[in-house]
Design a protein with these regions (language model features):
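Conserved active-site "lid/cap" helical segment
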Residues: 1-84, 92, 96, 155, ...
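Condensing-enzyme catalytic core mediating Claisen C-C bond formation in acyl metabolism
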Residues: 1-24, 172, 204-267, 271, ...
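Conserved catalytic cysteine-centered active-site region
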Residues: 2-4, 54-151, 190-216, 248-250, ...
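Short acidic, glycine/serine/threonine-rich loops at helix termini
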Residues: 22-23, 116-122, 182-186, 253-256, ...
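Beta-strand segments within the central parallel beta-sheet cores of soluble alpha/beta enzyme folds
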Residues: 45-54, 75-77, 105-110, 168-175, ...
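Short glycine/threonine-rich loop-to-helix capping motif typified by GTGT followed
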Residues: 58-67, 252-258, 294-317, 380-386
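Active-site-proximal alpha-helical scaffold in enzymes
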Residues: 81-111, 149-183, 224-230, 341-361
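Extended C-terminal subregions enriched in glycine
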Residues: 262-297, 306-309, 338-342
């Protein structure tokens, strides 16, 4: 183990309910999640001296501190690139703790992404902004690639052409996630599993991406408490050690996908994976369950390949016959993922990784020692190994 490995721990997790209309402000959602996480850890707001969130979060660290009764902050930070920031919020909290910059740091994300601003809509104005983002979007928007689903669809179609994958292969991810969500009382799709026939009959969003290949749009908030292993062991719950944490941006990186690369893949996730294995001293064979960012099912297959669980083009075979379901060789997204539980930019997946290691998941995998968690795909991204 090297670098950050073993020098910080997750001591608490918290969340609001997940819904399509929260009826509360985004600041209230953030405050509820933070206070819930502190209660889970057995800490009070006065113990917190650091806050981390996303650049896309509308709730400034100072506002959350005021709303929750947190006092002075020694560390505060925001990470960019949307869902790619999820694991990086925990990484930055861990770095602050390991370096002595803060003792208790809370990472949070909260939004009304369904009842207010919806990320999946066409936003043509992005391609005309007078900044580098406008230049990037101007490459893709004129060709109709103006939503996340459309961008993923182009790569999914090429992946099918290159490796013989089918829509049903993508559907296997959705079926697994919904199966897990069906037994999770906190999931939006609790009690609502689907079949592969349901997936194949769902309407097309951007060929070949179907409705049931797409994550939900959700209102809610999640928070994660990070502190030192020494302090964590004296708190309420079993400390979950951060065995590795990494960020990655590939060569010629764009948003959602980098169309001008020579090879089909997600090299930014491959870079994250290599760092995680190096820091932790582990291999894919050491992982009992994984939480893979599943905003769209095709990218779940590409992640399995980039992280070394299987070779290029082999993910369709790797996931066959229930391999990623509870009881399979690598259960993924045992909370239901963003397809089944809620889309909270990946933060709810980190919380599920903690539950698996505590032994408190509603879909508990036996004898869990190490959990891999990834953040948003197609963008500069991040990942964790928890143990």
């Amino acid at each position: 183990m090297t670098g950050l490995s073993g020098r910080s721990a997750i001591a608490g997790i918290g969340a609001t309910d997940f819904s399509k209309k929260s009826g509360r402000s985004e600041l209230r959602l953030a405050a509820e999640a933070v206070l819930d996480a502190l209660d889970d850890a057995g800490l009070s707001p006065s113990d917190v001296d650091g806050l981390v969130t996303f650049t896309m979060d509308s709730n400034l660290e100072t506002a959350v501190a005021r709303a929750t009764g947190i006092g002075e902050l020694k560390f505060f930070s925001q990470i960019g690139y949307g869902g790619g920031a999820a694991a990086a919020t925990v990484q930055q909290a861990a770095l602050a703790v390991a370096a002595g910059g803060a003792e208790v740091v809370v990472a949070y994300r909260a939004f009304n992404e369904r009842s207010e601003f919806r990320f999946g809509q066409v936003m043509t104005g992005l391609s005309s902004t007078a900044d580098s983002r406008g230049v990037e979007y101007s490459w893709s928007y004129p060709h109709g690639l103006s939503t996340p689903a459309a961008s993923v669809a182009m790569i999914a179609r090429r992946y099918m052409h290159e490796y013989g994958a089918t829509s049903a292969d993508f559907g296997a991810v959705s079926v697994a996630d919904r199966k897990h969500a069906a037994t999770n009382p906190k999931a939006f799709f609790y009690g609502k599993p689907i079949t592969i026939e349901d997936h194949q009959n769902s309407r097309m969003i951007a060929d070949p991406v179907r409705l049931l290949d797409c994550c939900q749009e959700s209102d809610g908030g999640v928070a994660i408490v990070v502190t030192t292993p020494e302090r964590a062991k004296d708190l309420k719950n079993r400390p979950v050690i951060i065995e590795a944490a990494a960020q990655g941006s590939g060569e010629d990186q764009f948003t959602m996908y980098s169309y001008y690369r020579d090879e089909l893949g997600l090299p930014e996730m491959g870079l994250v994976g290599r760092q995680l294995w190096d820091q932790s001293g582990l291999t894919p064979n050491d992982i009992q369950t994984a939480i893979l960012y599943d905003h769209f099912t095709p990218y779940t297959l590409l992640q399995l390949e980039e992280l070394g669980f299987c070779g290029k083009g082999e993910a369709k075979d790797f996931i066959a016959n229930g391999a990623i379901e509870l009881g399979g060789k690598l259960p993924i997204n045992t909370h239901g993922g963003q397809l089944g539980e809620a889309y909270i930019h990946g933060m709810n997946g980190i919380a599920e990784g903690v539950r698996q290691l505590r032994g408190t998941s509603v879909n508990q995998v036996p004898n869990v020692e190490h959990v891999l968690v990834t953040a948003g795909t197609g963008v500069p991204t991040s990942g964790l190994i928890l143990g």
